[in-house]
């Protein structure tokens, strides 16, 4: 009689563990995104945790967003928000999306440098695709001290920018 009772408790405990494991798997590892194509989220330097949530919510499923909020709360993500452009691919779970954003594992941007004649147009084209102000970039490219650090002068710094497509990070 005691062995039967022991078996019954053991079996019910195993069923409970299996159910809890299934719920945790669904909650954290099932698809975060409701879209069937890769979406990108850009986190700026002035974003806080609420703005990150609002940027993620158009792509996230209800349980995915809830899981992301849980992970962010327990791992103090609000204190460690990293800027960047992050890819949310179909099939990624909330844990995977959270880990990429917390560790700063960005998706690269394809930066196409066009053939332009002036530095101000070059700075304008580059700043459209990256987290960079065109006036700041223009000042850096026309600053004599910055150019000398790189071994160029203001007349030859344009030679660094060969028209082509490059994979770079957003920030």
Per-segment meaning from a language model:
Residues 1-171:
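Conserved catalytic or metal-liganding residues and their short signature motifs at active sites
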């Amino acid at each position: 009689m005691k062995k039967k009772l022991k078996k019954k408790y053991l079996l019910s405990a195993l069923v409970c563990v299996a159910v809890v494991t299934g719920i945790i798997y669904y909650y954290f590892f099932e698809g975060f995104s409701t879209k069937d194509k890769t979406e990108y989220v850009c986190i700026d330097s002035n974003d806080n945790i609420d703005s990150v949530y609002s940027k993620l919510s158009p792509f996230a499923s209800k349980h995915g967003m809830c899981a992301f909020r849980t992970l962010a709360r327990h791992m103090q993500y609000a204190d460690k928000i990293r800027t960047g452009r992050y890819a949310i691919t179909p099939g990624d779970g909330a844990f995977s999306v959270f880990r990429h954003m917390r560790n700063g594992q960005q998706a690269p941007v394809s930066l196409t440098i066009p053939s332009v004649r002036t530095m101000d147009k070059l700075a304008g084209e580059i700043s459209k695709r990256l987290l960079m102000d065109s006036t700041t970039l223009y000042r850096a490219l026309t600053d004599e001290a910055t150019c000398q650090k790189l071994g160029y002068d203001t007349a030859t710094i344009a030679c660094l920018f060969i028209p082509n497509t490059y994979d770079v990070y957003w920030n």
